[in-house]
Amino acid sequence: LEEIKQLKKEGLLKKNVLLGLGSNGLATEAQFDDLMTEIGDRQVYLINTRVPTQRWQNEVNALFDQMATKYENITLINWYQASDGQPDWFREDQVHPSEQGLIEYTGLIARNVLLP
């Protein structure tokens, strides 16, 4: 949130905002609402997560689904679905993307942002 506020203050927050939690933990609806207040009417591309080793994975993805419904300016990029059944896209820890996974992740983002 602080980074978004700083970018906005400096006039550097662009019309398209890419948000990805990655594999780093929980977010709450209140935190997300605060973030969306700062972002305003900009187009937001929200990437959900695949972290099968963490119990919060499904909770976060459910929150992201809810937020994509709540806010018209959010496009959900479904990394969870795209990476399903693709163990070679991840390192041995089943969390961090492999080289192939990084290619697929980047391609998924590009397709959603550039070819809506």
Residue ranges with predicted function:
Residues 1-34, 51-62:
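Conserved SGNH/GDSL esterase-like catalytic core that processes O-acyl groups on lipids
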Residues 10-12, 39, 69-70:
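Extracellular/periplasmic catalytic domains that process cell-envelope and extracellular macromolecules
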Residues 14-16, 41-45, 83, 97, ...:
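Functionally constrained cores in energy, signaling, and assembly domains
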Residues 15-21, 43-48, 75-78:
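Structural recognition of the beta-strand scaffold that forms the well-ordered cores
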Residues 33-41:
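Catalytic-core regions built around general acid/base machinery
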Residues 55-116:
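Catalytic His-Asp segment of secreted/periplasmic serine-dependent ester chemistry enzymes
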